[in-house]
Amino acid sequence: MVGLSNGEIPLVQIFVRDNNVDQALKALKKKMQREGSFREMKRHVHYEKPSEKRARQKAEAVRRARKLARKRAQREGLLPMPKKPGR
């Protein structure tokens, strides 16, 4: 996101090879997901008050901290490792 100012969404470029539009759409969706474009667009649908923004950011930070603590506890053997699906 170099050179972007005032919250602009970066342009994503995808090449269509051999008229394979389905594969190009899949690649576009994956790229936008990785860059966080969907989340950003969803966030800009409605105005978010500064107090709501702070509350959201704080909740996200708490969620990240809990996840990190849970992973750390699992690594140290304090919690059982999560079960893998399909096994």
Swiss-Prot record:
Entry superkingdom: Bacteria
Composition skew (Basic residues), residue ranges: 64-73
Composition bias type Basic and acidic residues, residue spans: 47-63
GO MF terms, alphabetically ordered: structural constituent of ribosome
Record bears the keyword Metal-binding: no
Family annotation (Pfam families): Ribosomal_S21
Region (Disordered) residue spans: 47-87
Keywords: Ribonucleoprotein, Ribosomal protein
GO terms of biological process kind: translation
GO cellular component: ribonucleoprotein complex; ribosome
Recorded family membership: Belongs to the bacterial ribosomal protein bS21 family.
HAMAP family, sorted: Ribosomal_bS21
Protein name, entry field: Small ribosomal subunit protein bS21
Organism per entry: Caulobacter vibrioides (strain ATCC 19089 / CIP 103742 / CB 15) (Caulobacter crescentus)
